[in-house]
From Swiss-Prot:
The lineage of its organism: Eukaryota, Viridiplantae, Streptophyta, Embryophyta, Tracheophyta. Mg(2+) 2 binds at residues 169, 171, 221. Pfam families: XPG_I, XPG_N. Residues 1-87 are annotated as: N-domain. Residues 136-221 are annotated as: XPG-I domain. One of its GO terms (cellular component) is nucleus. This is Flap endonuclease GEN-like 1. Its cofactor is Mg(2+). Residues 601-614 have a biased composition (Basic and acidic residues). It is found in: Nucleus. Its main location: nucleus. It comes from Oryza sativa subsp. japonica. Mg(2+) 1 binds at residues 31, 78, 148, 150. Coiled coil: none annotated. InterPro entries: 5-3_exonuclease_C_sf, PIN-like_dom_sf, XPG-I_dom, XPG/Rad2, XPG_DNA_repair_N.
Amino acid sequence: MGVGGSFWDLLKPYARHEGAGYLRGRRVAVDLSFWVVSHSAAIRARSPHARLPHLRTLFFRTLSLFSKMGAFPVFVVDGQPSPLKSQVRAARFFRGSGMDLAALPSTEAEASADALVQPRNAKFTRYVEDCVELLEYLGMPVLRAKGEGEALCAQLNNQGHVDACITSDSDAFLFGAKTVIKVLRSNCKEPFECYNMADIESGLGLKRKQMVAMALLVGSDHDLHGVPGFGPETALRFVQLFDEDNVLAKLYEIGKGVYPFIGVSAPNIDDLPSPSTKSLPRARSPHCSHCGHPGNKKNHIKDGCNFCLVDSLENCVEKPAGFICECPSCDKARDLKVQRRNENWQIKVCKRIAAETNFPNEEIINLYLNDDNLDNENGVPLLTWNKPDMEILVDFLSFKQNWEPAYIRQRMLPMLSTIYLREMASSQSKSFLLYDQYKFHSIQRIKIRYGHPYYLVKWKRVTRSMISNDPPSKQTELEGKNDKVEVLDGDDEVVDEEEEEPTMISETTELLDEPDVPQVLDDDKDCFLLTDEDIELVNAAFPDEAQRFQEEQRLKEAKSIARKSKLNVAGFETPKGPRPSGVQLSIKEFYRSKKGLSGDSGKDGSRKSSDVDLSKNLPKSVRRRLLFD
């Protein structure tokens, strides 16, 4: 949730819509609890009996984020919850249990007293530890927070350890985040929303401490109620009256009953007059009821109006509907009216704030402004991404998810190929892919997946003798049941030559997060793999092969352009002999054009009659036949 009162809707106009390539090469901090709760709930809604959806979601999302999007994820685990968040936790428990929310503690003090020693849900904690174990086998860095996970994500982003945060909690900005990705869909053509603090500052004029002040007024996870009568718009208007450096100090003054604005003689809010008892603006000078300008109607009829005589020849022109006088007297009266209206509004909201006890809550302010959220006294460690431990990973997922080892190895191939290409780009290693079994062969073509271009890379197996030496699980890890696969140039589909009927997918849960299964080309001599790889990464890892492919593409485009130009020229020329069989004929050679027969004009400018007399009395079908005879 984060900040209450639809705070995301207030920020939505300043969101940037980025594509899948935005995260390539960037470090991103992922709020692990957000993935475990939100995506697991979505899978259970589709398949209530899904087996450990939190592990399945994390596995495929991590593979997609690392290999398809090219990001470097850093996962953050929640620590002990703050007692200030007890009301939100209780409300979630009540909603999940179907209980009446009216039984919730009415005050923050009651909720905090009951929640001081309450740990997190044991089942949820077990789920998180399973996810941490899986991430360690995948080689991903995992950091533990003292309290809220989004607080540590924001700290990593603010200190430059990561480039963005992936979380749905809007209070990440209050913890210091600079870039927040709210929702990330890997297999979707639609761009995702990315919020930059710089855009919010330029659009709304809000900085970190001003957002903290808004959370105190509107409410948040640490104070559900906030100040009565404050919504996002009212809170925004109020905090914009102060600078970031003194906005919290002004809230302290108002909480103590001191009016913070100048121009009012009463220093205490209780001594301020109510809006209804304040004096009205001074009456303006008399104006003509006919034209609306300064003066009166009698004098204008007799001597004329100085303003009307400038714009017209009449002495006094009747004022139009919605007329607004722009004389100095009226401008001053309007300004005074707006000033009094703003003063009345300021007094009203200040009285609402002063009526709250223990406002502002200093614990909430310190929680948001704290920059020490890592559960490690030595500070943020060096972030490294290691190679996955395949043997332990296969055993873990086989036990937890009941997956076949071949299925696991197939899904891991995009991640392994990405790691291999990164190593080749950085050090030009002489090793091969998949335990030195496959080497880079060629680039087949450019492939568009979800609006992003990729290289379709062909990997060749080094020796066929290695297949017989592999264990059964590794021997079939990529070949599967079908040996003959045809790669189509036009579509991103794999077609089995022996089986034409569509096969049913046995996986009952949502498949949108799964990466593409590698394609296998197997013949009597060689075995090949086809994978989708990032274009820039392949160019850096194998520059010679990439340059050769680009030259071939340019030659193909040049030949295609030359062939099309020849066809266009041949279509306008009159054939003098038999045409080649490969040249498409013009449709005008088969059907006579009526426009060509009647296009010439006589000397008198009249058009010649057509060779075929199309009588209006003939049926339409007969006239059509006569036209082409």
